[in-house]
Amino acid sequence: MRVKCSISEDVETLINQQIKKEAHSSAIYLGMASWCARNGYEGAAAYFFKQADEERDHQMKFFKYVLDMGGNAVTPEISNIKQEYNSFREVFEEALEQEISVTQSIKNIAARCQKENDFLTLDFLNWFFKEQREEEIKARRAVELFDVIGEEGTGRWQIDKAVGAISYNSEA
């Protein structure tokens, strides 16, 4: 039953797709954490466990928003999560690609909201844009470590230790 929902069905559908994308991202990060832990990269595993938690938090924010606006939030089914990677670097390259994909998906919701003059949802999305900027910067920095430090000798060990220290401060 839809009683005075404050978002359109199109926006609701897009947000439900985003809920699934966030849940999928969380599961991807758990798979990455598992691979890293199994391969001795404990720092990276901890980094990806944290990322998985953050993605689930994002999923829940979207889920609650749909409900708060009188819509129907859909619990997503998640499958086909990658568990194996060819290299330590590949894990981080795919994490960056995932963050860029999430950002693009949120942009698509915002574009639809702009078209519909749905300023409440646009305001809600602003938090996610700031969050995604941070997530992309951190993921990009992790990939850059492979070029800065290199993988030879103790390079991967140093990268594993450095990943946990990556932070972002938006204050100039």
Predicted feature locations:
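Iron-associated oxidoreductase/ferritin-like identity signal
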Residues: M1-A172
